[in-house]
């Protein structure tokens, strides 16, 4: 039986660590990398007689997220105790939200795939609620024992729960990437997956197309997009194989082993009633006035979806280019800063050329140098000056790469005219004068009679060889379009 006989159903629960300086219910620091247990307050380690105090910054970030996804921000929500035993949970319960979460509903539009096969899909969200993180168990440095680090206990989390709207690992990864970009865009989470600031749990089940939902298994704590895709793909094949072999899927929590590429059983999956949720008597209901929500809404930056639409409408970019430029806040900021110092009048080639250079040459060079775009040696103004000279025909794309390399190496000085200084200093201005090009073309035709004869015999590749010879003779300065036109005219004569 083929994979097409089954429908995959995926929902994600994402834990985004909120970037507050202190914890959600105590004044202890949330800084990463401290020595074990030096950032655990009396509240975090559950000493008798201490009470939690809610961090308003965590609430503000939850509101910001709710506004960004078009959700309902609850005017009143309640904190609840989620009761379970684990060594790194000193209270014996986790403070979370259950029946009345702070964010309800909302949606995120994702783009899946590339090129002609790419499509957009809207994933509905169920809720997002505030909760505290647990501590961390340490096993590597102990023999026959485990250590407990409570530095992370009490760190503020926003748990973001999607509807089971995704039908493939590709859709799940696209959703996770879009969510990751959004929480960084609105500055509520640093998104550092290596440090555990953005962790995914995937609920996966399979069913016959149109049939009832199957039994789900939850894959816990996936901290990379690659592992998310691999884990879901393995789990889907495992579930299909189990059912087709006559077995039954049992509700369970599983872990993904990156070394084997397989999921393995962690424990049977609990339901909500197993946690005996009840309102936390130490915390009043969270009341959010409408004025607070209105203020947060007024302070929101332009969101990726709106910016993408603006890039398409105002600059004529393709949906792919606009999506790529708005995939991260830093990339979008660089591109907009570049346009701010360039000619963007209607009909200008600069926006499209600039997009190509930001996503092409600049991105490739940054990747090779292992640098972020915010640390680029080529400033937005310098790139704007370079792109402007390509657009007005001063230099060709090939020459532009030489100018870009010089800019990268710190030549030309600062500002939008840095490219101009390099062009003049190195004599790189493109030759557009037909009277200057004609002798070069005549020399190439005279010296390459074989290629001329081959072209006239119908071999198109011979024409490209002749163009290459002219460009070589001009040391790359000839206008390629003009060379093409003049060569064709002479060869057709």
Swiss-Prot record:
Q: Could you say which EC number(s) this protein's record lists? A: 6.3.5.-
Molecular-function GO terms, alphabetical: asparaginyl-tRNA synthase (glutamine-hydrolyzing) activity; ATP binding; glutaminyl-tRNA synthase (glutamine-hydrolyzing) activity
What PROSITE patterns does the record point to?
Answer: GATB (PS01234)
Q: Name one GO biological process term.
A: translation
Which InterPro entries does the record cross-reference, listed alphabetically? Asn/Gln-tRNA_amidoTrfase_suB/E (IPR017959), Asn/Gln-tRNA_Trfase_suB/E_cat (IPR006075), Asn/Gln_amidotransferase (IPR018027), Asn/Gln_tRNA_amidoTrase-B-like (IPR003789), GatB (IPR004413), GatB_Yqey_C_2 (IPR023168), Gln-tRNA_amidoTrfase_suB_CS (IPR017958), Gln_synth/guanido_kin_cat_dom (IPR014746)
**EC top class, as a word:** ligase
**SMART domains assigned:** GatB_Yqey (SM00845)
User: Organism's domain of life?
Assistant: Bacteria
Write the record's keywords in alphabetical order, separated by commas: ATP-binding, Ligase, Nucleotide-binding, Protein biosynthesis
Its catalytic activity? L-glutamyl-tRNA(Gln) + L-glutamine + ATP + H2O = L-glutaminyl-tRNA(Gln) + L-glutamate + ADP + phosphate + H(+); L-aspartyl-tRNA(Asn) + L-glutamine + ATP + H2O = L-asparaginyl-tRNA(Asn) + L-glutamate + ADP + phosphate + 2 H(+)
Q: Which family does it belong to?
A: Belongs to the GatB/GatE family. GatB subfamily.
Its quaternary structure? Answer: Heterotrimer of A, B and C subunits.
Function of the protein: Allows the formation of correctly charged Asn-tRNA(Asn) or Gln-tRNA(Gln) through the transamidation of misacylated Asp-tRNA(Asn) or Glu-tRNA(Gln) in organisms which lack either or both of asparaginyl-tRNA or glutaminyl-tRNA synthetases. The reaction takes place in the presence of glutamine and ATP through an activated phospho-Asp-tRNA(Asn) or phospho-Glu-tRNA(Gln).
Protein known as: Aspartyl/glutamyl-tRNA(Asn/Gln) amidotransferase subunit B
């Amino acid at each position: 039986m083929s994979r097409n006989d089954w429908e995959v159903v995926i929902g994600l629960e994402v834990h985004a660590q909120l970037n507050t300086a202190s914890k959600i219910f105590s004044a202890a620091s949330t800084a990463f990398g401290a020595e074990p247990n030096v950032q655990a307050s009396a509240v975090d380690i559950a000493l008798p007689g201490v009470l939690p105090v809610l961090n308003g910054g965590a609430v503000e970030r939850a509101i910001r997220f709710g506004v960004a996804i078009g959700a309902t921000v609850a005017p009143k929500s309640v904190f609840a105790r989620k009761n379970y035993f684990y060594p790194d949970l000193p209270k014996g319960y986790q403070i979370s939200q259950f029946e009345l979460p702070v964010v309800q509903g909302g949606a995120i539009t994702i783009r899946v795939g590339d090129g002609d096969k790419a499509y957009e899909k809207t994933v509905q969200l169920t809720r997002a609620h505030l909760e505290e993180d647990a501590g961390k168990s340490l096993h590597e440095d102990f023999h026959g024992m485990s250590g407990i680090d409570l530095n992370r206990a009490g760190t503020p989390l926003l748990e973001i729960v999607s509807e089971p709207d995704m039908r493939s690992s590709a859709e799940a990864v696209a959703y996770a990437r879009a969510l990751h970009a959004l929480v960084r865009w609105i500055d509520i989470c640093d998104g550092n997956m290596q440090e555990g600031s953005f962790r995914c749990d995937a609920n996966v089940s399979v069913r016959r197309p149109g049939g009832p939902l199957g039994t789900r298994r939850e894959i816990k704590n996936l901290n990379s997009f690659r592992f998310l895709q691999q884990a879901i793909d393995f789990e889907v094949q495992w579930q299909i194989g189990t059912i087709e072999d006559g077995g039954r899927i049992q509700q369970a929590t599983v872990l993904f082993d990156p070394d084997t590429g397989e999921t393995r059983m962690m424990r049977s999956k609990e339901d909500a009633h197993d946690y005996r949720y009840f309102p936390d008597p130490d915390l009043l209901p969270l009341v959010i006035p409408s004025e607070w929500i209105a203020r947060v809404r007024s302070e929101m930056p332009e969101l990726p979806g709106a910016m993408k639409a603006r890039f398409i409408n105002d600059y004529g970019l393709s949906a792919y280019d606009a999506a790529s430029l708005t995939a991260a806040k830093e990339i979008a900021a660089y591109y907009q800063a570049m346009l701010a110092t360039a000619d963007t009048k209607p009909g200008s080639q600069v926006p499209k050329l600039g997009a190509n250079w930001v996503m092409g040459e600049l991105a490739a060079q940054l990747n090779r140098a292992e640098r972020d775009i915010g640390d680029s040696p080529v400033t937005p103004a310098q790139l704007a000056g370079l792109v402007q000279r390509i657009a007005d025909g001063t230099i060709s794309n090939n020459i532009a790469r030489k100018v870009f390399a010089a800019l990268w190496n710190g030549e030309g000085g600062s500002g939008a005219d840095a490219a101009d200084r390099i062009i003049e200093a190195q004599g790189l201005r493109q030759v557009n004068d037909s009277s200057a090009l004609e002798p070069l073309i005549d020399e190439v035709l005279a010296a390459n009679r074989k290629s001329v004869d081959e072209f006239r015999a119908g071999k198109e590749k011979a024409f490209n060889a002749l163009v290459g010879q002219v460009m070589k003779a001009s040391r790359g300065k000839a206008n390629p379009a003009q060379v093409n036109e003049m060569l064709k005219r002479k060869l057709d004569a």
